């Protein structure tokens, strides 16, 4: 009888040990996958050729057939639609903030914002949801291209700023035609904003 009890106890211990091992393995794999999701934008950005990437090729192909409003940043391989509306527009591209304050055709301050980092369920989804992840890699002199209402506008970056989250002045109308791009810092929405200011090329 005691042998049978010992055998049952040993089997129970064996099952518990097996289950704990499976749980530990799943937790380790989950942690590794989480690191992959978090690191995807950073890892892939190391391989961007600023002179020859998907965006630079697309700009050349679409020059004579502009069909939608888009933002292109060749240096960091950004190719995004933009639209007015609310924050939900950033799920599919960039958000045109304060349209009444400016646009490429009429001048003023044309302001676009997009997510810096949003984790998706897959590496591809994380990359798609985090278009401005590499906005900090832009420098003065870099080119930004805007397609607006069937016309292509070329801008050059003249300034970079870091501002507080409540710095609403970055969206105010300007006397000169200006493009303003901004996104949260990697520290999050409460940490601040990285701002890019560009002027229209003549």
List the predicted regions and their residue ranges:
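Solvent-exposed, non-transmembrane regions of membrane-associated and secreted proteins
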Residues: 15-21, 28-202
């Amino acid at each position: 009888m005691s042998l049978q009890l010992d055998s049952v106890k040993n089997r129970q211990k064996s099952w518990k040990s097996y289950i704990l091992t499976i749980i530990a393995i799943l937790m380790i794999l989950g942690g590794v996958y989480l690191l992959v999701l978090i690191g995807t934008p950073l890892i892939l950005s190391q391989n961007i050729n600023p002179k020859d990437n998907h965006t630079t090729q697309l700009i050349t192909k679409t020059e004579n057939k502009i069909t939608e409003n888009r933002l292109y940043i060749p240096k960091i391989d950004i190719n995004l639609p933009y639209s007015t509306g609310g924050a939900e527009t950033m799920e599919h591209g960039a958000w045109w903030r304060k349209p009444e304050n400016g646009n490429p055709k009429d001048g003023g301050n044309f302001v676009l914002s997009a997510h810096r980092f949003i984790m998706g369920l897959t590496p591809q989804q994380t990359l798609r949801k985090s278009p401005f992840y590499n906005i900090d890699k832009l420098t003065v002199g870099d080119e930004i291209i805007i397609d607006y209402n069937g016309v292509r506008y070329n801008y050059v970056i003249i300034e970079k700023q870091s501002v507080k989250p409540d710095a609403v002045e970055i969206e105010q109308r300007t006397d000169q035609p200006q493009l303003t791009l901004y996104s949260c810092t990697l520290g999050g929405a409460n940490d601040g904003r990285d701002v890019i200011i560009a002027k229209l090329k003549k």
